[in-house]
Amino acid sequence: MRVNITLACTECGDRNYITKKNKRNNPERIELKKYCPRLKRVTLHRETK
């Protein structure tokens, strides 16, 4: 079951990325290092509802 998720920057709170994940393989929340355009650097992005 693939669902759409939003990734939000942990430092500024902006929701910068939309992606999909498989809930069966990854039931926990995803954390990825992605580029934040507001801070102009790579930061940790977490899955939000």
Swiss-Prot record:
Cited Gene3D superfamilies: Ribosomal protein L33
Listed GO CC annotations: cytoplasm; ribonucleoprotein complex; ribosome
Source superkingdom: Bacteria
Gene Ontology MF term list: structural constituent of ribosome
InterPro entries recorded: Ribosomal_bL33 (IPR001705), Ribosomal_bL33_CS (IPR018264), Ribosomal_bL33_sf (IPR038584), Ribosomal_zn-bd (IPR011332)
Keywords, comma-separated and alphabetical: Ribonucleoprotein, Ribosomal protein
Any one Gene Ontology BP term: translation
PANTHER family per record: 50S RIBOSOMAL PROTEIN L33, CHLOROPLASTIC, LARGE RIBOSOMAL SUBUNIT PROTEIN BL33C
Family: Belongs to the bacterial ribosomal protein bL33 family.
Protein name, UniProt field: Large ribosomal subunit protein bL33B
Gene: rpmG2
